[in-house]
Swiss-Prot record:
Residues 673-686 have a biased composition (Basic and acidic residues). The keyword Cytoplasm applies. Keywords: ATP-binding, Chaperone, Cytoplasm, Nucleotide-binding, Stress response. It comes from Lachancea kluyveri (strain ATCC 58438 / CBS 3082 / BCRC 21498 / NBRC 1685 / JCM 7257 / NCYC 543 / NRRL Y-12651) (Yeast). One of its GO terms (cellular component) is nucleus. GO terms for molecular function: ATP binding; ATP-dependent protein folding chaperone. Residues 665-693 are annotated as: Disordered. The keyword Nucleotide-binding applies. It is found in: Cytoplasm. This is Heat shock protein homolog SSE1.
Length: 693
């Protein structure tokens, strides 16, 4: 049975949660952090994923790729690419399919990876973290992504999960996942005919800002509106601080960090810390040692100065809120509560602006960093066939209208708007077309002008085959089950022909009919399913052959990472054994080895040490094991003698302690018997006494 796994795929860091023990738990990583850096680094032999990649980011800056969720499914020629590219220190390139990829130096040569591959590497890493922490089987996952993700980006994330060995049961909007977390754990929601509670969720993370308004009743929620600014987040504040100090240090210290990626990265990391400090303090010092050219830099920044630096950003705070309210047809007064989510909402100026926009105090019922992951884990649990969870129904909404079109044959129309903007999903619509033979269908966004700049209106295409028209007929009715699935993906779930047949139907007898009345029948026409048709889908999903090739590649890279880690462990074990054994040989092991054994073992240790720091510095796992076992063949004999003597001492001490206890017990028993004897004698003397006059 798979443990339900929820992943809040963040731009700067990601949070993992699982459903277990009748609750939702956050997974800590290998260094006990409750979030894991969202990046992938490449080295001479292996990859550095998550925490290890973050630790090496500054020294390995050109071969470390972060901001992964921003380039998944993104065209190199998309208008967003120019804006995104400034956040990357690694080299981004245009792939053969027109998508964005990253070029890095890995295993001694230049290699290029697609954004989907990079996301898969990271997802595989966090899956491994979850498996190690839970010690269970994890195959199903619900992944939280931005509400503005297109159909193509959702397919790309789903493919990345599959490459990582997971089954993506749902790609869910991140703020919707937070709303689910709110609805599941709130115990005071209205019921029955009571008015729903309207809650606005404002999520400002590392790179994006979303406002979602939802209506709640006990056991259910309905998303009323979602609006966003996909280029507004904590990284913009970090960059504003960094650019400010870049100008200052150019004048003050005559250095230009913009010309040195490592220096810029160090100032950027320090700027992120300063931003957090200024959320709790009105001013703070800023210093970084040896930034570049052996120059130490220092300065300070006040909260007021920061707000002035980011004033263009602050002027955009209310726009998503205004749009969401208009979309939901609500006034700020009609919103009952405003919940804030995401680390960037801790910035005081943002909190004040959000509060003023709604005209009410902000609520912090949810854990700002973990609510999305917990909601995603619960959603994954809903899909589990073996896990029972409390009933909870939720619906998201289509941000844009979607129409289906088909080859024009018998009908006057050749298209239909099936899922209007603002309608709920998941949902299914059944349509009937008169067809003369096999045909094609397409799904497109109805109004291209409503889409974000650069977004393609194309969604998917399907070929429907197997249509057979009966002799004497010119066409046949075809029913199509059109569906927007729980992940917001548009599919044709079923397609089949129908025909009308004549059947005899029993006529109900009148209430006063005699018991022996003969049954009456009438002939009626019924429409029944005739032939199931073949649906060949052409979507943004990877084709099976390409997907399998990427799965195989990821498995190879994972095996190599594992081998490198195990090799390093064996090398460290050998080094530790050399130092430990050498020290003990002159101390606690001294009396348990002959002079000849000491001399021989010290020579072996010296040779092993010389080898380890020379030709063995970069050797293979098997050689480290062989060297270790060679030393252990004699070292363990000496150690065995020492342990045997120690055990002998312990046994002697234990025997002595037991003898002491037995003697003490015997002494107590003797004293007890003596006391009882004296008591009896005293009683006998008392009974024998006779009083004489």
């Amino acid at each position: 049975m798979s443990i339900p796994f929820g992943l809040d795929l963040g731009n700067n860091s990601s949070v993992l949660a699982v459903a277990r023990n009748r609750g939702i738990d956050i997974i800590v990583n290998e260094v006990s952090n409750r979030s894991t850096p969202s990046l992938v680094g490449f080295g001479q032999k292996n990859r550095f994923l998550g925490e290890s990649g973050k630790n090496k980011q500054t020294s390995n800056i050109k071969n470390t790729v972060d901001n992964l969720k921003r380039i998944v499914g993104l065209d190199y020629d998309h208008p967003d690419f120019e804006q995104e590219s400034k956040y990357f220190s690694s080299k981004l390139v245009k792939l053969d399919d027109g998508k964005v990829g990253a070029q890095v130096r890995f295993a001694g040569k230049q290699q290029t990876f697609s954004a989907t591959q990079l996301a898969a590497m990271y997802i595989n890493k966090v899956k491994t973290t979850a498996v190690q922490e839970t010690k269970g089987n994890i195959t199903d996952v619900a992944i939280a992504v931005p509400a503005w993700y297109t159909e193509e980006q959702r397919y790309s994330i789903g493919d990345a999960a599959k490459i990582a060995g997971l089954n993506p049961v749902r790609i869910v909007n991140d703020v919707t996942a937070a709303a689910v977390s709110y609805g599941v754990f709130k115990t005071d929601l209205p019921e029955g005919e009571e008015k729903p509670r309207v809650v606005a969720f404002v999520d400002i993370g590392h790179s994006t800002y979303t406002c979602t308004i939802a209506a709640f009743k006990k056991g259910e929620l309905k998303v009323l509106a979602t609006a966003y600014d996909k280029h507004f987040g904590g990284r913009d504040f970090d960059r504003a601080i960094t650019e400010h100090f870049a100008d200052e240090f150019k004048t003050k210290y005559k250095i230009d960090i913009r010309e040195n990626p490592k220096a810029y990265s160090r100032i950027l990391a320090a700027a992120e810390k300063l931003k957090k400090v200024l959320s709790a303090n009105t001013a703070a010092p800023f210093s970084v040692e040896s930034v570049m050219n052996d120059v130490d830099v220092s300065s300070q920044l006040s909260r007021e100065e920061l707000e002035e630096l980011v004033s263009p950003l602050l002027s955009r705070v209310t726009e998503p809120i205004t749009k969401a309210l208009a979309q939901a047809n609500l006034t700020p007064e009609e919103v009952d509560y405003v919940e804030i989510v995401g680390g960037t909402t801790r910035i005081p100026s943002l909190k004040n602006a959000i509060s003023e926009a709604f005209g009410k105090q902000l609520s912090t019922t949810l854990n700002q960093d973990e609510a999305i992951a917990k909601g995603a884990a619960f959603i994954c649990a809903i899909h589990s066939p073996t896990l029972r969870v409390r009933p909870f129904k939720f619906e998201d909404i289509h941000p844009y209208s979607v129409s289906y079109s088909w080859d024009k044959q018998e009908e006057d129309e050749d298209h239909l708007e099936v899922f209007p903007a603002g309608s709920s999903y998941p949902s299914t619509k059944l349509i009937t077309l008169q067809r003369t033979g096999d045909f094609s269908m397409q799904a497109k966004y109805t109004n291209k002008e409503e889409l974000p700049e650069g977004t393609s209106a194309e969604i998917a295409k399907w070929d429907i085959t197997g249509v057979q028209v009966s002799e004497g007929e010119t066409s046949v009715p075809v029913k199509l089950k059109l569906r927007c699935d729980p992940s917001g993906l548009h599919i044709i779930e079923d397609a089949y022909t129908v025909e009308d047949i004549k059947v005899q139907e029993l006529v109900p007898l009148p209430a006063d009919a005699p018991e022996d009345a003969e049954p009456e029948y009438r002939e009626v026409t019924k429409t029944v399913k005739k032939d199931t048709l073949t649906i060949i889908a052409h979507t943004f999903a990877l084709e099976e052959k390409a997907l399998n090739a990427l799965i195989e590649k990821e498995n190879e890279l994972s095996a190599q990472d594992k081998l490198v880690a195990e090799t390093e462990d064996r090398k460290n074990a050998l080094e530790e054994y050399i130092y430990t054994l050498r020290g003990k040989l002159d101390e606690e092991y001294s009396d348990f080895a002959s002079d000849d054994e000491k001399t021989r073992l010290k020579e072996m240790l010296a040779k092993a040490e010389d080898w380890l720091y020379d030709e063995g510095y970069d050797s293979i796992k098997a050689k480290y094991i062989a060297k270790y076992e060679e030393l252990a063949s004699l070292g363990n004999i000496i150690r065995g003698r020492y342990l045997a003597k120690e055990e002998e001492k312990r046994q002697a001490l234990r025997s002595k302690q037991e003898a002491s206890k037995m003697a003490e017990l015997a002494e107590k028993l003797a004293a007890q018997r003596k006391a009882e004897s004296e008591k009896k004698e005293s009683k006998a003397d008392a009974e024998g006494d006779v009083e004489l006059d």
